[in-house]
């Protein structure tokens, strides 16, 4: 393994990044990943970071903030490259990006049944929040 190189996504990365998200099971029918990438790239308060090992995209994170709290989405590590520190490195880069923006709190959402992801975030020092998340579909679809 060479040193992981992390930088912002560029145009040529979009399709490989979406393919990685699909391999990792991160895409959902109601969220167009291409639109999510485009939105993150055109705003000053968000970006998509890409980790490369020998030029191959092996990890990603979409990171943004609302001025007070940072959020990460689409945290992905190539399934063939797990347990090599890629996840820790891409999350550290997201934290650095938020610190540079003056953000001191980072939040994320994980499905309760995703034990592997929950263990990973616990190992990074994340704590289970006492907050309860509510949601409502504004287009009339049934809750998920």
Task: Walk through the language-model features, giving the residues of each.
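Conserved SAM-binding loop
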Residues: 6, 110, 123
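Conserved GNAT acetyl-CoA-binding A-motif
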Residues: 98-110
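Acetyl-CoA-dependent GNAT
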Residues: 4, 8-74, 78, 91-93, ...
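A short, acidic/glycine-rich surface segment
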Residues: 59, 116-120
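Conserved acetyl-CoA-binding loop-helix of GNAT-fold acetyltransferases
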Residues: 77, 83-96, 119, 123
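Conserved beta-strand-loop-alpha-helix junction that forms the acyl-donor binding cleft
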Residues: 108-117, 135-139
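Short, charged/polar, Gly/Pro-enriched secondary-structure boundary elements
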Residues: 141-144
């Amino acid at each position: 393994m060479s040193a992981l190189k992390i930088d912002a996504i560029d145009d040529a990365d979009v399709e490989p990044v979406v393919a990685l998200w699909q391999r990792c099971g991160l895409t959902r029918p109601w969220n167009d990943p291409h639109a999510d990438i485009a939105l993150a790239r055109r705003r000053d308060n968000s970006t998509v970071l890409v980790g490369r090992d020998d030029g191959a995209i092996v990890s990603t994170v979409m990171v943004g903030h609302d001025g007070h709290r940072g959020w990460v989405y689409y945290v992905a590590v190539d399934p063939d490259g797990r347990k090599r520190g890629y996840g820790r490195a891409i999350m550290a880069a997201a934290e650095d990006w938020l610190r540079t923006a003056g953000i001191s709190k980072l939040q994320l959402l994980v499905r309760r049944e995703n034990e592997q992801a929950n263990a990973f975030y616990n190992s990074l020092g994340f704590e289970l929040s006492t907050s309860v998340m509510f949601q409502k579909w504004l287009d009339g679809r049934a809750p998920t």
